[in-house]
UniProtKB/Swiss-Prot annotation:
The gene is DSL1. This is Dorsalin-1. GO terms for molecular function: cytokine activity; growth factor activity. Keywords: Cleavage on pair of basic residues, Cytokine, Disulfide bond, Glycoprotein, Growth factor, Secreted, Signal. PANTHER family: GROWTH_DIFFERENTIATION FACTOR 2 (PTHR11848:SF157), TGF-BETA FAMILY (PTHR11848).
Amino acid sequence: MHYFGVLAALSVFNIIACLTRGKPLENWKKLPVMEESDAFFHDPGEVEHDTHFDFKSFLENMKTDLLRSLNLSRVPSQVKTKEEPPQFMIDLYNRYTADKSSIPASNIVRSFSTEDVVSLISPEEHSFQKHILLFNISIPRYEEVTRAELRIFISCHKEVGSPSRLEGNMVIYDVLDGDHWENKESTKSLLVSHSIQDCGWEMFEVSSAVKRWVKADKMKTKNKLEVVIESKDLSGFPCGKLDITVTHDTKNLPLLIVFSNDRSNGTKETKVELREMIVHEQESVLNKLGKNDSSSEEEQREEKAIARPRQHSSRSKRSIGANHCRRTSLHVNFKEIGWDSWIIAPKDYEAFECKGGCFFPLTDNVTPTKHAIVQTLVHLQNPKKASKACCVPTKLDAISILYKDDAGVPTLIYNYEGMKVAECGCR
């Protein structure tokens, strides 16, 4: 992507981040740009000589905004981001993006791997396997856990002469107390008991355990699940040893998938702040109207000339139409801006942007507000009293995004709002 293509992409991220939080674009005032913004549309060689733009500082501001909107305090460490995300999370992301009718019950999905595993197996009890899985679960307070699933890969080591059919039973407990792994007297709560008849991935709902962990005191509660597998004998012959995969040299490790929703009132706050911003802008225009500033006769003639009907050639009409406010393409590639280490998917996407001017008379296709119409009329009469209405995003769409959080936990947000321009208008 060209240098200024990256700059345009980052500009969109800054606007999007501020719109989704309902905040003014304060960072723009902090950027060390010494010339008018129009300079960026000149020849690239001229820009380098005529402006003093700190691209590194600009990129850092943009990254800070995006991290904050994803509830990240910093970019995850390289050690954690280098770990391959579970295939389940990638498949889940691909399913949601490919099939728009596939809507999850919750907007946020996290995948937690085991922090530690202790296997308690007695050599005498060939058909009986027991594992204690320790997880480190961290869910923000403003999120509500709606569902939790334990995904386990069942393996079967068949013996010679054993029947082809498999049969066994798996029981999962929530370990309520007990700091020692070998504490057989620890209190347990039965979560699920399920018959096993095949190898491969199995899913078990453990919502009650995870909800308890989230609400409990982390200093007193251990996020532990006890998994017990028992193989059954069929016609006097053991089917083999049923077990779960827990060794770290495989991709089939146990996964705890936690579904949650953001229950904060961020949307309500955004609407209130946006309304306050609109009122502030209206007051600003009215204050300017109350002053006795007057523009030059030449400026007034130029603005009024736009409103007068005149005969245009077909080429001129096409040129004017192309300059009106509209949505245009803007392709964003996360690798080119150095964010691909923690954003897993998408690698790139079409963000779109708004380009063009808001000329009098404002037509319905740019959905002008009453304020924009009044502002345009005031500018037409006296450009010094009010600026033109701006071509800006009036509707933003969401995308699905898969990234790693501060702790390196793969996190999928199904509807990450405000990442793609849907409509443009004059405001």
